[in-house]
């Protein structure tokens, strides 16, 4: 399965769980301490990153989704750093600040790419009033399409059963990254994402794929779960659902450098994809591709839609094919930053013919990258009348994406692509026919941004309408 990126800008996700601050100290080591047989690190720089549930929220935001987060913190400097960092990424924070507790902080000392020691500053949050989290959840639920419960067994999800019940009552799916050997508190969840070690800690040693599926189905029935996604390290991941065939996904990791936060990435991409309208199996394929990227990075890491697109389609930009608007905007910025000239055109392209192919080839020669914006079915119907389009949007886009001249294909639902063009801002806007440049939709915006508008001629004797008429007349 090669999934298509959704528009994560349509995804609202609420994250509730154990938030923490990950701190890194970096420096070289050249000697052993005279005080004890340990290396001496000369600290030269440092870094601070949101971790735990906060890393999940960062992942949602980096994809372009709308993340809201609820968690427990202290009233201290790490809490301030967490909030400011997340707010800068447009994550809406609604933390419960408890002065008697420290904000969970993990300090890692790094040298030559290796972690020498980790120091944890934390106390488990216990006996907190469940209403502190539940009321914050109630405020957020009307604004989201998915809920993630990120459990690191630090106390934020002490009342997880009530959180699941409240989300399900609102018909919002609940995705949980579980912790520990007891899955009873997660009863009724939409999906759990245990790794293999966590899964085997609950069900015992797994001897084969069939054994994994059988044991997963047992857990699903016992705890009334919607599904289980077991992440299996070098063996990829397996999605198990009742009354459906298991869905096995091989790993896409090329090099494993650091698995820190990989589980956060899996559940965030999974939930965001479902929130954006993807079916569960396709959302899992996207999450699997994302995991293959982040394990090649150091520490708790996020990924962009560009990195996710490259993981799915390969590193060559020309393989992007069909792409969501938000991902396209990022792709165009990346291409322009490399000095590439981006050309854009648009049309219905209902029945692709030689005239279309010739036109697109000529457009592609004017730059380094070619975008084709395609009218959706409803847009075509408004423009062309009943009976059109002959081919639905997904098929028209798939055919265009298969042309060597075309780099990206993106749909638009309006009568004209003016809004889309004003967001993308290509270097050159091209239109076929006898238009005047100033009359082309989006042309003014492109020119105002320093771009160009150009009109190309269509090949004579090629017309979609004529082809349709010929078929109807039995002459084709």
Swiss-Prot record:
Region (Ribokinase): 1-318
Top-level taxon: Bacteria
GO cellular component: cytosol
Disulfide bond positions: none
Keywords: ATP-binding, Carbohydrate metabolism, Kinase, Lipopolysaccharide biosynthesis, Multifunctional enzyme, Nucleotide-binding, Nucleotidyltransferase, Transferase
Coiled coil: none
SUPFAM superfamilies per record: Nucleotidylyl transferase, Ribokinase-like
Name of the top EC class for this enzyme: transferase
GO biological process, any: lipopolysaccharide core region biosynthetic process
Reactions catalysed according to its record: D-glycero-beta-D-manno-heptose 7-phosphate + ATP = D-glycero-beta-D-manno-heptose 1,7-bisphosphate + ADP + H(+); D-glycero-beta-D-manno-heptose 1-phosphate + ATP + H(+) = ADP-D-glycero-beta-D-manno-heptose + diphosphate
EC number: 2.7.1.167, 2.7.7.70
Pfam name, any one: PfkB
GO molecular function term, any single one: heptose-1-phosphate adenylyltransferase activity
Binding site for ATP: 195-198
PROSITE patterns, A to Z: PFKB_KINASES_1
Spans annotated as Cytidylyltransferase: 344-476
CDD domains in alphabetical order: RfaE_like
Catalytic residues of the enzyme: 264
Pathway terms, separated by semicolons: Nucleotide-sugar biosynthesis; ADP-L-glycero-beta-D-manno-heptose biosynthesis; ADP-L-glycero-beta-D-manno-heptose from D-glycero-beta-D-manno-heptose 7-phosphate: step 1/4; Nucleotide-sugar biosynthesis; ADP-L-glycero-beta-D-manno-heptose biosynthesis; ADP-L-glycero-beta-D-manno-heptose from D-glycero-beta-D-manno-heptose 7-phosphate: step 3/4; Bacterial outer membrane biogenesis; LPS core biosynthesis
Membership in a protein family: In the N-terminal section; belongs to the carbohydrate kinase PfkB family.
Oligomeric and partner information: Homodimer.
Functional description taken from the UniProt entry: Catalyzes the ADP transfer from ATP to D-glycero-beta-D-manno-heptose 1-phosphate, yielding ADP-D-glycero-beta-D-manno-heptose.
The protein, known as: Bifunctional protein HldE
